[in-house]
Amino acid sequence: MKTEQTNLSSKVCLVTGANSGIGKSTAHALAMMNATVVMVCRDRRRAEPVRDEIKSATGNQNVELMICDLSSQADIRRFAAEFISSHSRLDVLINNAGVVVRQRSLTEDGIETTFAVNHLGYFLLTNLLLDLLKQSAPSRIVNVSSAAHAYGKIDFDDLQGEKKYGGFSAYANSKLANVLFTYELARRLDGTGVAVNCLHPGTIATGLFRNLPKPIEALIKLVTFSPDKGAETSVYLASSPAVEGVTGQYFAKKRERQTSSASRNEESARRLWEVSEQMTGLPG
């Protein structure tokens, strides 16, 4: 991946889902810029070789691995407390981890898995790290969404797909939630020096869609490109001086783009925020 030669040697960057796909490429690119990179992954056995690979390839020894299961709210809380106790600053938070779940399933918290990981995981982790991000301002939050958000719908009577569930629709709904969350968070962070943006990485050749029906999976493979290419917009939003102070926007191919009309509904964004607070036990 071609990266701008920004020096991030004084910056701490956290990337979730950093052991494969876009997350791995993002972590690698930020390590090339001399950032302290904290890889947040679920499986230590799979992630340790990736951390070592990034260290070796970049010569940057400040690449750390921390373990967190983003489907578990208790584990997110444990991880956030551990991170805050071991790091005095956080300059960039990249919410990248995501899942596609073909058959409806529930987390240990009793929440539909796609919504739990792809939306509530972003929401809870970000809120728990917000004070540290504010203390480190100017800082940045980057939420990896998708153009699939345009196919999503936020049905407050069926947020968890109890009445009707499909793997792609659940994914699209969660990506719409990412955009609504980004816009609402940007409004709430106005004046704090913390910028928050979201992005469409492109359709990436990763394992994310392996749980979709075979015909759809085959079609997606025809239009995908590499994780390195897909990570470019995440890295751009995390590091580029060109977007200093830019907040509350959606990007694709490193350019601002307009999102769906549903994603720009401020009442939906506020309501989703309130419901998310209730579902994660955060104070309103």
Question: Model features per residue range: what roles?
Answer:
Residues 190, 213, 239-242:
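Hydrophobic alpha-helix feature that most strongly marks membrane-spanning transmembrane helices
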Residues 174, 198, 218-258, 264-270, ...:
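C-terminal helical subdomain
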Residues 16, 163, 167, 216-220, ...:
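A short, mixed-charge helix-start or loop-turn motif at secondary-structure junctions
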Residues 154-159, 211-213, 251:
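Short, flexible, mixed-charge acidic loops at enzyme active sites
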Residues 204-219:
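A glycine/serine/threonine-rich, flexible loop-to-helix segment
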Residues 270-284:
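Intracellular terminal tails of multi-pass secondary transporters
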Residues 1-205, 282-283:
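Rossmann-fold NAD(P)H-dependent dehydrogenase/reductase core
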